A protein has these predicted regions:
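Extracytoplasmic gate region of multi-pass secondary transporters
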Residues: 49-107, 114, 190
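C-terminal membrane-cytosol helix-exit motif in multi-pass small-molecule transporters
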Residues: 8-35
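A late C-terminal transmembrane helix in Major Facilitator Superfamily
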Residues: 166-203
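Juxtamembrane helix-start motifs in multi-pass secondary transporters
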Residues: 3, 114-120, 206
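Structural signature of the two symmetry-related core transmembrane helices
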Residues: 116-131
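Intracellular juxtamembrane helix-capping segments at the cytosolic ends
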Residues: 154-167
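Interfacial helix-cap and linker-helix signal at transmembrane-aqueous boundaries
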Residues: 1, 77-78, 108-109, 193-202
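Paired small-residue
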Residues: 128, 139-147
Length: 211
């Protein structure tokens, strides 16, 4: 609780000046830049609203899977007898590696495009979740959590890139907000439903299967 408080103070102090800087940043985008940004991208035979709905649905689903280890890792470690500190360390490994993957997947999106990137990230996230099923030792949880973090961190940013490339620029703010809102719903739903599954089965096995 104290940590969250001081993080909030840091965000308040640091983000307000940054927002002031961005507010005065001149927008130099033009029609030619918009054409150049998307000329190498494959066309999508969907309406704007259809693509929006698909992205929101994908955002919910990917974050249901993403939230399961993040929300319940500490409890899983405590249940396995590793203790609270080990659970916190494993969660930190997962989140730090997720920070790295956000940057790496950003470079990857520039190279192969956001659609292949999001498919690759989702596939790797699924594979890493599968590895949680047979392994429950302390070392294996460190390794699988590292793998999971490296796979999932770049998924959500790819949604914003897809919107930038395939949907009207004038609507980008609203559309990105809707997709990110859907991912937050997915994170909440995934954490809750995994807890419900654990309460019913007294095991996280089916919770990982659900993810």
């Amino acid at each position: 609780r104290t940590t969250h408080f001081w993080i909030s103070i840091f965000c308040l102090v640091s983000m307000l000046p940054i927002l002031g800087f961005l507010k005065n940043y001149k927008n130099i985008q033009n029609e030619e830049a918009n054409i150049m940004s998307s000329k190498d991208e494959p066309s999508i035979k969907l309406s704007n609203n259809q693509l929006q709905i698909i992205l929101m649905f994908a955002g919910v689903c990917c974050c249901v899977a993403m939230s399961m280890p993040q929300v319940h890792m500490v409890a899983l470690c405590v249940d396995n007898g590793f203790g609270l500190q080990v659970g916190t360390e494993i969660l930190a490994v997962m989140l730090y590696s997720g920070m790295i993957s956000r940057i790496v997947f950003g470079f990857l999106s520039d190279k192969i495009g956001p659609l292949p990137t999001i498919l690759l990230g989702s596939f790797l996230q699924m594979v890493s979740l599968v590895f949680f099923l047979p392994f429950n030792s302390q070392l294996s949880l460190y390794m699988v959590s590292l793998m999971f973090g490296l796979s999932q961190g770049g998924i959500v940013p790819a949604y914003a890139i897809i919107i930038r490339k395939y949907l009207p620029l004038q609507q980008a703010g609203v559309r990105v907000g809707l997709v990110l809102g859907a991912t937050i719903v997915g994170m909440a739903l995934g954490g809750w439903i995994s807890g419900e599954i654990f309460d019913l089965t007294q095991s996280y096995y089916l919770a990982f299967v659900n993810g």
